[in-house]
């Protein structure tokens, strides 16, 4: 709270439409109900659990704080179905599309 609240206030001062910090046990459902456009999670597991529940096949993981853009499909490698013809590439395609959209903005 001592770091997040001043960061949110600084973004508001720059004209950004932001809200928070929010309790993680409710914010993802609120986002799913279109109260927010995006949720920034402070921890990997805190963000992945609801993202996988709400959008396993179309969720995109965006890693912040790197010197390069990193997006990935929001599921594992599924070695158990590798080379069986069962894998669905759609979430990887969505991840690539998101990376291209971000680089254009």
Curated annotation (Swiss-Prot):
What does the miscellaneous comment read?
The active site is located at the dimer interface.
Task: State the organism named in the record.
Answer: Enterobacter agglomerans (Erwinia herbicola)
What EC number is given for this enzyme?
1.1.1.262
The family database entries (PANTHER family) matched by this protein are listed as: 4-HYDROXYTHREONINE-4-PHOSPHATE DEHYDROGENASE (PTHR30004), D-THREONATE 4-PHOSPHATE DEHYDROGENASE (PTHR30004:SF6)
Binding-site residues, a divalent metal cation: 44
Binding residues for substrate: 52, 61, 70
Gene encoding this polypeptide? Answer: pdxA
Q: Name one GO biological process term.
A: pyridoxine biosynthetic process
Q: What class of enzyme is it?
A: oxidoreductase
UniProt record similarity statement? Belongs to the PdxA family.
Q: What does this protein do?
A: Catalyzes the NAD(P)-dependent oxidation of 4-(phosphooxy)-L-threonine (HTP) into 2-amino-3-oxo-4-(phosphooxy)butyric acid which spontaneously decarboxylates to form 3-amino-2-oxopropyl phosphate (AHAP).
Location relative to the cell: Cytoplasm
**InterPro entries in alphabetical order:** PdxA_fam
Cofactor binding, per record: Binds 1 divalent metal cation per subunit. Can use ions such as Zn(2+), Mg(2+) or Co(2+).
Q: Name one GO molecular function term.
A: 4-hydroxythreonine-4-phosphate dehydrogenase activity
| UniProt keyword annotation of Cell division present | no
Protein's name according to its UniProt entry: 4-hydroxythreonine-4-phosphate dehydrogenase
Keyword annotations of the record = Cobalt, Cytoplasm, Magnesium, Metal-binding, NAD, NADP, Oxidoreductase, Pyridoxine biosynthesis, Zinc
- Pfam families in the cross-refs: PdxA (PF04166)
Among its keywords, does the record have NAD? yes
Q: Which cofactor does it need?
A: Zn(2+); Mg(2+); Co(2+)
Q: Name one GO cellular component term.
A: cytoplasm
Q: Which reaction does it catalyse?
A: 4-(phosphooxy)-L-threonine + NAD(+) = 3-amino-2-oxopropyl phosphate + CO2 + NADH
Q: How does it assemble?
A: Homodimer.
């Amino acid at each position: 709270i001592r770091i997040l609240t001043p960061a949110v206030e600084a973004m508001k001062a720059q004209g950004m439409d932001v809200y928070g910090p929010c309790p993680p046990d409710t914010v993802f459902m609120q986002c799913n109900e279109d109260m927010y456009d995006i949720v920034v999670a402070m921890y990997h597991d805190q963000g992945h659990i609801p993202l996988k529940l709400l959008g396993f096949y179309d969720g995109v993981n965006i890693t912040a704080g790197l010197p390069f853009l990193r997006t990935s499909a929001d599921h594992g490698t599924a070695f158990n179905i590798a080379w069986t013809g069962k894998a669905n590439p759609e979430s990887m395609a969505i991840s690539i599309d998101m990376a291209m959209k971000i680089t254009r903005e």
